[in-house]
Curated annotation (Swiss-Prot):
Family: Belongs to the acetylglutamate kinase family. ArgB subfamily.
Protein name: Acetylglutamate kinase
Reaction(s) catalysed by this chain's protein: N-acetyl-L-glutamate + ATP = N-acetyl-L-glutamyl 5-phosphate + ADP
Keywords per UniProt: Amino-acid biosynthesis, Arginine biosynthesis, ATP-binding, Cytoplasm, Kinase, Nucleotide-binding, Transferase
Residues annotated to bind substrate: G67, G68, R89, N190
Keyword Kinase tagged: yes
One CC-aspect GO term: cytoplasm
Gene3D superfamilies (UniProt xref): Acetylglutamate kinase-like
InterPro entries referenced in this protein's UniProt entry, alphabetically: AceGlu_kinase-like_sf, AcgluKinase_fam, ArgB, Asp/Glu/Uridylate_kinase, Glu/AcGlu_kinase, NAGK-C
EC number: 2.7.2.8
Annotated site residues (Transition state stabilizer) in this chain: K32, K250
Compartmental location: Cytoplasm
Presence of the UniProt keyword Repeat in the record: no
Amino acid sequence: MPSQPSSQDKAKILAEALPYIQRFHGKTIVIKYGGNAMTEENLKKCFAHDVALLKVVGMNPVIVHGGGPQINDMLKRVGKQGAFIQGMRVTDAETMDVVEMVLGLINKEIVNLINQHGGRAVGLTGKDGSFIRAKKMLVRDKERGQEWVDLGQVGEIEGIDPALIELLETRDFIPVIAPVGVGSRGESYNINADLVAGGLALVLNAEKLILLTNTPGVLNKDGSLLTGLTAQEVDELIADGTISGGMIPKISSALDAVKSGVKTCHIIDGRVEHGLLLEVLTDEGVGTLIKAN
């Protein structure tokens, strides 16, 4: 059993956190919440605690959550097989109904947990106030010779109106957002949560974008953690296949964000207890730092 930190150790931890609390006071931090951190009970409580604490010390956390594993489980229960192309879920009308139902349940659970830990969280989707406008996404399928593929009700972001989120921030609420957008005819679109988080970071002029994953960060082909990457290095890693699958939308979101003015993006291990606090409030941080150059 690991030894408990002494009072002096705790004082050192608080002293190390102080300059970061001062630096990020009043700043917006967009956090994409997903992976094991959403399914393991202790990790869920740690995340809710961390988010509430960041708000208490003066930061403005904005949460965007996924729900891939839970959606997959529900699709199996109703007899549907999930399919992915370039890390994006193929979404027909029936699948979209399941996506909205499951994301709604997840959203309320996150809101409730944060509130239990002293925060004031409010659950939203991009359809509320039509603040995330979307259109149909087409992707090239490399396995079909770069053929354009219709993914159904999978959307790409046309625009985000930050007014609703900014209003909630000024009233000291914590927005918790499910990644569903609305089309021009009122139709629902399933949008990759990493891309929604990146888009929100841009329009909110966020100080940081943090993406929680089920890996220590971005790994090279030997499985070693890459602690820092530039845009050029990311392009090279995608070209040689080191970055693939579900990591591609995360990296794309990170690159778009830092190229457009978000100061830093971090891809961190959501399986580490209090990893969010370690990233924001300590000297070393955790995971992979993405920079424009």
